Amino acid sequence: MQITKTLVATLFAASTAFAAPTPADKSMMAAVPEWTITNLKRVCNAGNTSCTWTFGVDTHLATATSCTYVVKANANASQASGGPVTCGPYTITSSWSGQFGPNNGFTTFAVTDFSKKLIVWPAYTDVQVQAGKVVSPNQSYAPANLP
């Protein structure tokens, strides 16, 4: 009986030793400089049915691209999702979240260069963009590779 247990244990140990190797994890972070979103501001009309975002996308590898991005809604455009909008080589979309409670809302953009298969997700709090002020300092984001 003891020899049977030993043989079974040896077989289990041998089978795990020869199992197929697990592939290494692959980083999806791109080997390019961070992208800087420059001079971003949001201006909403008095009825909050339209908000215009203006900003630049600077990859530090080409001339910066200026973007004007308008989000329209029947109400609360400052909290509405928007896009897609094309700005030069980029496709821009956005979504607002209030997940952290009252007065802690924020908007996250997806800035995608499909030709280079790169994306960044810049995010700005409602406080940063209130009353049409320009966000300062500019914020930079590490691009990720699209699969």
Swiss-Prot record:
Induction: Induced during growth on maize and banana roots. The keyword Secreted applies. GO terms for cellular component: extracellular region. Keywords: Disulfide bond, Secreted, Signal. GO terms for biological process: effector-mediated perturbation of host innate immune response by symbiont. Its main location: secreted. Disulfide bonds join 44-51, 67-87. Residues 1-19 form the signal peptide. It comes from the Eukaryota. The keyword Signal applies. It is found in: Secreted. Homodimer. Stimulates salicylic acid signaling in host plant roots. This is Effector TSP1.
